[in-house]
Amino acid sequence: STLNVLRYSSLAAGIVYGAYHTYTLKLEGEKKQELYDYQKKLKLVEAAKAEYRKLNPPKQAASTEAVNLDDPEFDFGKFILGAVEKLGS
């Protein structure tokens, strides 16, 4: 009788442990799969950004010239026409 109690108690403990172990392995696998999917999405986003940069290169910034309005030889009309010309192109 005592032997049967020990036998069935061991069987029940083994079943509970097996269920717990299976559950933890399943959770670990799901976490690894989520991480893998996330890394894959990051790689796709980086590839898309690189392709966008390749297809649409950044525009060159217009050079800024130092303008001294107090200079007596400064031609304001020429400066304005040059600025309008730069905006038009």
From Swiss-Prot:
Q: Does the keyword Lyase apply?
A: no
Q: Name one GO cellular component term.
A: proton-transporting ATP synthase complex
Q: Name one GO biological process term.
A: proton motive force-driven ATP synthesis
Name the Pfam families for this protein.
Answer: ATP-synt_E
Topology term for the membrane: Single-pass membrane protein
What sections of the protein cross the membrane?
8-25
Alphabetically list the UniProt keywords: Acetylation, ATP synthesis, CF(0), Hydrogen ion transport, Ion transport, Membrane, Mitochondrion, Mitochondrion inner membrane, Transmembrane, Transmembrane helix, Transport
Annotated coiled-coil segments of the chain: none
Q: Which InterPro entries match?
A: ATP_synth_F0_esu_mt
N-acetylserine, modified sites: S1
Q: What is its main location?
A: mitochondrion
* GO molecular function list: proton transmembrane transporter activity
Cell location: Mitochondrion inner membrane
Tell me its family: Belongs to the ATPase e subunit family.
Subunit composition and interactions: F-type ATP synthases have 2 components, the catalytic core F(1) and the membrane-embedded component F(0), linked together by a central stalk and a peripheral stalk. The central stalk, also called rotor shaft, is often seen as part of F(1). The peripheral stalk is seen as part of F(0). F(0) contains the membrane channel next to the rotor. F-type ATP synthases form dimers but each monomer functions independently in ATP generation.
Role played: Mitochondrial membrane ATP synthase (F(1)F(0) ATP synthase or Complex V) produces ATP from ADP in the presence of a proton gradient across the membrane which is generated by electron transport complexes of the respiratory chain. F-type ATP synthases consist of two structural domains, F(1) - containing the extramembraneous catalytic core, and F(0) - containing the membrane proton channel, linked together by a central stalk and a peripheral stalk.
Q: What is this protein called?
A: ATP synthase subunit e, mitochondrial
Please spell out the taxonomic lineage of the organism that makes this protein: Eukaryota, Fungi, Dikarya, Ascomycota, Saccharomycotina
Gene this chain is encoded by = TIM11
